[in-house]
Amino acid sequence: LSIKYGLKGPNLATVTACTTGLHSVGLAYRMIQMGDAEAMLAGGSEATVSPLGIGGFAAARALSTRDCAPSEASRPFDKRRDGFVLGEGAGVLLLESYESAKRRGANIYAEIVGFGMSGDAYHMTSPDKIGTSRCMQNALSNAGLNQEDVCYINAHGTSTQIGDKN
C-alpha cells in the first residue's frame, strides 16, 4: 500500500492472529503519540476461507456444525455455542494526531486514549484469564483510567467452549 499510494514514514506488518487489526491500530496510535508520525493507516484483514483454513479449524473442532443461517450459528458465550462460522473481511482506519486533524478540518469520530497488549504464554486457542486481565490493566494504565470508567468491552468471543471460557 505504501508504494501504491506513496505513503512514507514508519510502517510495519503486524501478525498476531485474531488481534492483528487491533494491534495495528494500537501500535499506530503509539507511533503518533511518540511523534514518529502525524497520521497513519492501520488495520487488518482475514482470508481463511481456503482448504487449509477450513481443514485446520475443522480439525480443531472450532467450526459450528449447526444447519442454520450463518448469522444464527455463531453464538459467542451462549450455553449452546458450538463454534464459529468462517468469514473474510478487512478494515483500515486513518489515525492522526489531534492537532493534524484540527488543522485539516477533519470530522473527528473518536479518540484513542489508551492501548494495552499482553501475551499470556499459555495456549494458542485457550487464553489465560491472567494475560487477558493484564492486557486490560495495561490499557487502563496507559489511558489514565480506572475500571469503573469503562462502559464497553469488545470481547473476543469465538463461540467455542474453550475460547469463551476466559
Whereabouts are the PLM-identified features?
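Conserved small-residue
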Residues: 1, 21, 28, 57, ...
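Acyl-CoA/ACP chain-elongation machinery
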Residues: 38-82, 115-127, 157-164
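Beta-strand segments within the central parallel beta-sheet cores of soluble alpha/beta enzyme folds
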Residues: 11-16, 37-45, 107-115, 148-155
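Conserved catalytic cysteine-centered active-site region
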Residues: 1-27, 59-85
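Residue-level signal for alpha-helix termini/capping positions
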Residues: 6, 33, 141-144
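Condensing-enzyme catalytic core mediating Claisen C-C bond formation in acyl metabolism
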Residues: 68-145, 151-152
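Non-catalytic positions within long, well-ordered alpha-helices that form the structural scaffold/packing
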Residues: 29-33, 41
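Short acidic/polar capping segments at secondary-structure boundaries
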Residues: 7, 17-20, 45-48, 99-100, ...
